[in-house]
Amino acid sequence: MTPVVATPNEDAATGNTSGYRLDLDGLRGIAIALVAVFHVWFGRVSGGVDVFLTLSGYFFVASLLKHVLATQPASASWGRAINPWPRFWRLVRRLLPALLLVLAFTAALIALVMPTTRWGPLGAELQASALYYQNWHLAFESQDYAAADSANSPMQHLWSMSMQGQFFVLTLLCALALGGLLRALSLKVEFFRRPRVVRGIVGFALLGVALVSFAWANYRHGINQPFTYYDTVARLWEPLAGGLLAVWMPKLALSARLRNLLSLVALGLIITCGWWIAGVQEYPAAWALVPVGATLILIWAGSPATARPAEGQARVSRGLAHPQLVWLGSIAYALYLWHWPLLIFYMAWRYQDEVSWLEGTGILGVSVLIAWLTTKYVEAPLRSGSLRRKKTVARTTDGDAAPDTTIKPTQTDKPGFQNSRGYRGALLAILLVISVAAGSAAVTWQRDAANATLDTENLDPRLYPGGRAFLNGAPVPKVTAQPSPDVVGMDWPITSYDSIISGWKDPSIKVGYYGDVDATRTIALVGGSHAEQWITALNDIGKRHNFRVTTYLKVGCALTTEHVFTWFGQKYYQCNDWSNRVMERLAVDKPDYVFTTSTRPPQGSEKGDNVPKDYKEIFARFRDRGQKVIGIRDNPWSTGKLKPPECLASGRKPEVCGVSRAQAMAPTDPAAALADEFPNMTFLDYTDAMCDDTYCPAVVGNILMWHDYHHLSATFVRSLIPAIEADLQKATGWW
């Protein structure tokens, strides 16, 4: 969000602090309204955060520029020039109180509302949010920020707070270092003491970094957009654009009509860009110039630098200074902090992925009320700290305040218990205690998750028949299902633990050797993670029947002749290249059989699985060179709001946590219809082991079927070994 408390005049770069920009408070009010409304109802990025970042840079850089200019005279002390602690302490005092309160609230509700399967990951996010690296945490997790649902993190929105905090600290240190260098030079050469020279050096430094950041954002946009969305380096150009305007405010006088027109167009762009720009897919690359540029225009058009003599602010600027918008801007920081977790917890409690207009209105109303209380009784008292109260606006022209925490200049001077030293001290102590408690809980959650053990290889098959319950009618005793939802997320194939699967960006072909590694007979397991999951069975069967299993695996990449897309919507060029090279490698290695998936799940609103066109092309290439293939039908994919283990951990029944058979699977194996066309292929189908006539539940035969949304748990695959063993014997005749 955007840092400003009793901000300096818009003409800060010139040293004029005679006015207070209420219109920019109102702009913050509009921006936070857009952010909250789009989050609650529309599942889109509004561009409001980009407005906040631009305003942040404008005010913060203006404040730092004033500091650098003020420390150039020889009479100024070196301590004042380069000591970062006073300003850093202001940042801490203004940013942390409200954030810590929200995180403490979030920690409590995680324990009350969220399934235990999510406590470990959410504990990591609590830590990341409190320590201001949440954006990097999410970047490496590559979470989709497009829409809110009950499976989202209640701290996902804090990426912008983390990014902005990093910007503040980096910019502060760089500004003080540059100021110290210029001061050292100015003591020897008077030229470096001139304000115009100082502004020029600062401006060109900002411009250089901003251009590099903008270029990086556009370059990375085409490579890994989900990561780039949260990348601080890719985002830096947005606040730096505001900072450049603070340094180089154009003093071009315009007519009132032209200023009104520019302001109206800019405001219209800010309000509407969320509808016609897919922010998640496009920001912070070139399309982010729309909200950022529009914000710069509103700052500039409302500045006295653009007004002709005897003309006041543009009408749009006066409209933005409406008291209600200014008030909304004054609570924008707290409102940003509160609205998202309230939305996420409500949807988790109700087990839904969207809210009605009535529900959304209630959530926003509660958010506004809590934000106002937080601003008045937590944020404002601690922001004022022990500083002397002064009656002039200039007392708070630092510009390095907490995001969107602007209050009217004299508000903290009003009498009230919340402004007493005793209240501030007690509040600070309470927040510290809560923070330590929440932090300890987060660390405990993470430690417990890391230390959780998974040992299901020796389950009694009489108690845990798994797929044999549906396939063979094996009895199912009443025992606790295994693995526990808390640990099933680690129930992966051995190849994942051995790292014998190429990642998204890894172009290499990693060949693993399993089963009887010294055998001459070979089955090659080839494809993506849905082929990989069968290694659990093939490894065991290979050891007992003397054949080797070689693996050629890549995340998200079944063998294909066409470009496929990653789950976040970008072309997966590496998959196509990898597939071609693996096909060439298989022609050289010549395994006795290739084992791979033969179908794909339905897309979007479609029902039933299918055999894609590019699968058939791969099958034809195998047929034409005489390669024998065992094609296994893909398993059903769950479609619930939560991962099946999370759904189970929340106390819901296995049927509720699964998927309709008619939705996930075609009535018969669509690949089996290709038998005449591909006589080199054998087709396996274990749908009847995973689903009854109507439903594919999350628990089958006392075993959790999925370890996430759609990958089979290794324990469940292990329960299918007898069936797979019999089918492989028929296909190969090896034993």
How should these model regions be labeled?
Residues 279, 350-354, 368, 376, ...:
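Extracellular/periplasmic envelope-modification machinery, especially enzymes
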Residues 1-13, 496-507:
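Short coil-to-helix leader/linker segments, especially the first N-terminal amphipathic alpha-helix
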Residues 2-394, 413, 423-427, 433:
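Membrane-interface helix/loop caps of multi-pass membrane proteins
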